[in-house]
Amino acid sequence: MRVFIDEIARHVDQEVELRGWLYQRRSKGKIHFLILRDGTGFLQATVVQGEVPEAVFREADHLPQETALRVWGRVREDRRAPGGFELAVRDLQVVSRPQGEYPIGPKEHGIDFLMDHRHLWLRHRRPFAVMRIRDELERAIHEFFGERGFLRFDAPILTPSAVEGTTELFEVELFDGEKAYLSQSGQLYAEAGALAFAKVYTFGPTFRAERSKTRRHLLEFWMVEPEVAFMTHEENMALQEELVSFLVARVLERRSRELEMLGRDPKALEPAAEGHYARLTYKEAVALVNRIAQEDPEVPPLPYGEDFGAPHEAALSRRFDRPVFVERYPARIKAFYMEPDPEDPELVLNDDLLAPEGYGEIIGGSQRIHDLELLRRKIQEFGLPEEVYDWYLDLRRFGSVPHSGFGLGLERTVAWICGLAHVREAIPFPRMYTRMRP
């Protein structure tokens, strides 16, 4: 009976077949210890001289890393074995042998080497754990919104304009010289969806032509972007907190083994799963950053009216044991579509959610302008071509209502939950300013 490693605990004292690859091998006297991987996990298999045909024992002594195998044996519970179980091998069959020396041996390798061989590095424990957690987060995102009655709404990747009027766009030439751009966000289209279906979410790749070499930036990354009709700024933040606490709790519940592989202490994530995220206004956050800057020379002062940089976000987020909201920024440093604060029109009803431990922003959201004339004026103030946004203005001409939404960056969220130093490890094949291969 063929089984997978992630279900091995259900087959103790049973004869099973595993199909996979040799990850590591060592020998001690009359025992060969084979660490097998099958895409669902890693398992120790023991080949004992005298318990298998001599030809099988000799074969096991000369298997190179990444040999593809079929292995038959009995599952045993053994606390000494990695994962608490092992396979007592009865027989094995080589399906294929590596053609040459496998590049990623047991010695230490630098990150550039590993990224050059990303197509092979994905087979190893660390990327395995990260991708399993990423997969769990994606599944949980769909479950979260599906259970709350949201419609999955697919936004186009080719768009005629930028969402926020930025120049950081990848341009694509279409037919007859017409130009389009790779989407930076599905938000504008999600707004159309929300006014048709009340509550929607988009989930897909987005593109930013940023010449950034920071640990938080990719050229291509994934975002989930919900949008809800009649939702206020306060309700928007409540939904963000509910989502993030749900995601963290799901990983703690189902991916503790992978967190252990990464050396990530689950206790560091438990406060985030509980909710109760602090809220700071932009003004309060600037004051806190400047107090920190007086104590820490690595944190630059932040004049009021400027946006937070990575050092500011990191310094702020380290003061909290769970994500923290920063809300109500000056309108002049935020996007044209954000609703002004009725208590102070110089501010907007927006928020950023910063992950703790120095990870910084993982969510940006706002209440959107729903008044036609105000939105038209903002488009003009930002120097944007009104004809490109005419369809977007239609959303305000016909049945306009207050509405809100946000975008959660998947890779930044994965990096925080996994405790990664760089977002390049949070996506299978990262696309960065300095890397486009493999």
UniProtKB/Swiss-Prot annotation:
Keyword field: Aminoacyl-tRNA synthetase, ATP-binding, Cytoplasm, Ligase, Nucleotide-binding, Protein biosynthesis
Enzyme class (EC, first level): ligase
Reaction equation(s) it catalyzes: tRNA(Asn) + L-asparagine + ATP = L-asparaginyl-tRNA(Asn) + AMP + diphosphate + H(+)
InterPro entries: Aa-tRNA-synt_II, aa-tRNA-synth_II, aa-tRNA-synth_II/BPL/LPL, Asn-tRNA-ligase, Asp/Asn-tRNA-synth_IIb, NA-bd_OB-fold, NA-bd_OB_tRNA
GO biological process: asparaginyl-tRNA aminoacylation
GO cellular component, one term: cytoplasm
UniProt main location, coarse: cytoplasm
Protein location: Cytoplasm
GO MF term set: asparagine-tRNA ligase activity; ATP binding; nucleic acid binding
Family that this chain belongs to: Belongs to the class-II aminoacyl-tRNA synthetase family.
Subunit structure: Homodimer.
Designated name of the protein: Asparagine--tRNA ligase
Record organism: Thermus thermophilus (strain ATCC BAA-163 / DSM 7039 / HB27)
Lineage of the organism: Bacteria, Thermotogati, Deinococcota, Deinococci, Thermales
